[in-house]
Curated annotation (Swiss-Prot):
The active site is at residue 90. It comes from the Bacteria. Belongs to the DMRL synthase family. This is 6,7-dimethyl-8-ribityllumazine synthase. It comes from Burkholderia vietnamiensis (strain G4 / LMG 22486) (Burkholderia cepacia (strain R1808)). InterPro entries: LS (IPR034964), LS/RS (IPR002180), LS/RS_sf (IPR036467). (2S)-2-hydroxy-3-oxobutyl phosphate binds at residues 87-88, 129. NCBIfam families: lumazine-synth (TIGR00114). The gene is ribH. The lineage of its organism: Bacteria, Pseudomonadati, Pseudomonadota, Betaproteobacteria, Burkholderiales.
Length: 169
């Protein structure tokens, strides 16, 4: 049996991408952002189609993402941050709440969000992961923006088929 299959599309030309970057653990977050922006450019996203905003910490990321999503100007969003374990429960709170908020915004607004908020045990782990995670966030944003647009067209095609059937009746 042959089945239809969507092939991943990493062509970024014409896509509008919003990035929200935490300033807490700034060296790591700057490394994430540098790698992400470099990869977006490699994928064909124009610098004029990227907006980067910064927020104090990971817990503020969801609100900024929500504001960008509400604008309707973006094909995908990216969350960048670093939560590094300390000696208190705060690590779990920030990790869980920021992640849940990021996911909720994407689902509420039907908008892809690449979550590149690192959660690590120490600074060394964060530094070791920042470059590849930044690049990965760019690839996820571009691929998911293209996928959601392609899937949205499926709905448009079904509406056209229904309109054709009504015209024939």
């Amino acid at each position: 049996m042959e089945i239809g299959q969507y092939q991943p599309n990493l062509e970024g030309d014409g896509l509008r991408i919003g990035i929200v970057q935490s300033r807490f653990n700034e060296p790591v977050c700057n490394g994430l952002a540098d790698a992400c922006v470099e990869e977006l450019e490699r994928l064909g996203v124009s610098g004029e189609d990227v907006l980067l905003v910064s927020v104090p910490g990971a817990l503020e990321i969801p609100l900024a993402l929500q504001k960008l999503a509400e604008s309707g100007q973006f094909d995908a969003l990216i969350a960048l941050g670093a939560v590094i374990r300390g000696e208190t429960y705060h690590f779990e709170l920030v990790s869980n709440e920021s992640g849940a908020g990021i996911t909720r915004i994407g689902l509420d607004f039907n908008l892809p969000i690449a979550n590149a908020v690192l959660t690590t045990e120490n600074d060394e782990q964060a530094v070791a992961r920042m470059t590849e995670k930044g690049r990965d966030a760019a690839r996820v944003a571009v691929e998911m923006a293209n996928l959601t647009m392609a899937l949205d067209q499926l709905g448009d095609d079904e509406e056209e088929d229904e309109d054709d059937e009504e015209e024939r009746a």
